[in-house]
């Protein structure tokens, strides 16, 4: 059984690699956001508690996140393991899971330099009407600044503006550095395998690096 955590900054290609890893290991992809939405939709006592917390604008506690993860891992599709995309997000959540005897086998961090992330994300352009995506360097439109099909102007989303990307990267580093330290210690103690891969490689190159370690 493989219970895998996948970490990486926004724009590192986690979603693509998560899908490839899930296919390779025959495990479901699990995200904290999905679990919170499913809990609220279920109408359970825990779901109602989560709904009230989210409505108030507060953060869901590490204990509740831990309970949701523990419950999710008992479902039949997790028989071969699971892949957590982007979570746990804090050392508090990681410690809570360890205290609940939830065992992870692999923690993977996709590393990409900040300047490369900014280049990747700030180069994105989108056609608002259709959602068609372009990149000024990697997938440019035929006519700069305009959608190939409609000829209408493309926009840059707020989330993709360099100053916004840098803020998000700052938050990621603040949260993740203590988390990677936590899992490095667990790896050194033999509880799991923690490794970093170079996310600046091609999609297939990154996946090859990951699959060799699994």
What spans do the regions from the language model cover?
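Glycine-rich phosphate-binding loop of ATP-dependent small-molecule kinases
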Residues: 1-214
């Amino acid at each position: 059984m493989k219970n895998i955590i996948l970490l990486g900054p926004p724009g590192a290609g986690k979603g693509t690699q998560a899908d490839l890893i899930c296919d390779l290991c025959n495990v479901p992809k699990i995200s904290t956001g999905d679990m919170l939405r499913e809990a609220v939709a279920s109408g359970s006592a825990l779901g109602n508690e989560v709904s009230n917390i989210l409505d108030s604008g507060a953060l869901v506690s590490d204990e509740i996140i831990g309970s949701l993860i523990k419950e999710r891992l008992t479902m039949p599709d997790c028989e071969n393991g699971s892949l957590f995309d982007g979570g746990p997000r804090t050392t508090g959540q990681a410690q809570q899971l360890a205290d609940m005897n939830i065992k992870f086998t692999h923690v993977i961090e996709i590393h990409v330099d900040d300047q490369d992330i900014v280049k990747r994300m700030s180069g994105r352009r989108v056609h608002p009407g259709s959602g068609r995506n372009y990149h000024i360097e990697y997938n440019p439109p035929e006519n700069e600044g305009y959608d190939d099909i409609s000829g209408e102007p493309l926009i840059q989303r707020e989330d993709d503006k360099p100053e916004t990307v840098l803020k998000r990267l700052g938050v990621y580093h603040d949260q993740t550095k203590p988390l990677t330290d936590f899992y490095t210690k667990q790896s050194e103690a033999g509880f799991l395998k923690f490794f970093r891969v170079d996310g600046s490689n091609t999609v297939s190159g990154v996946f090859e690096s990951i699959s060799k370690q699994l």
